[in-house]
């Protein structure tokens, strides 16, 4: 078996058939760029940001994803997140497994309903020196609202605000399949 490295690795999987288990979420595949966004929470000032989201596969029962966001005006890098969206074969159960650049890892589980996904955190881990407040709960939705339009909404609760509140909303346009 050849050893694959760097870009050759991702290029080599472009013709791999999609795993049967993830056909229910193949509508996510591709590269998406934000066209509208907002961030808010009771403890911060509202803001806008830009983001690119990429969903790909390598023939396994999961999609790989990455989210890269930056400040709307300055272009300064903000949030980075990467992980997997894994489907329990033969079901509509899905798990969202992510690592984030500010020291948080999440496991969210939920269901796929048509062209929508509803998730809720089951485990949130954080590095010992992450700054407060502590995120204690996350709920996330993905919804394909038109053939090339995807929306994501993220709700959260923290050690300071224990009720789940909307934190992020973004509408993406597909820019590459």
Cite the ranges covered by each PLM segment:
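Acidic, glycine-rich flexible loop segments
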Residues: 103-104, 118-139
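A short, structured loop/turn motif at beta-sheet edges
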Residues: 55-61, 86-92, 110-117, 143-149, ...
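Helix-adjacent hinge/juxtasegments
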Residues: 72-111
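Amphipathic/hydrophobic helical signal segments and adjacent flexible N-terminal regions
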Residues: 2-62, 66-77, 137, 147, ...
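Short, surface-exposed beta-strand-loop junctions and turns on beta-sheet-rich folds
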Residues: 71-72, 102-104, 125-126, 158-159
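A short secondary-structure junction signal
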Residues: 107-109, 131, 152-155, 164-166
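Short hydrophobic/aromatic-rich beta-strand segments that constitute the beta-sheet cores
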Residues: 34, 63-67, 93-98, 117-121, ...
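A structural detector for short beta-strand units
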Residues: 51, 81-83, 106-108, 138-140, ...
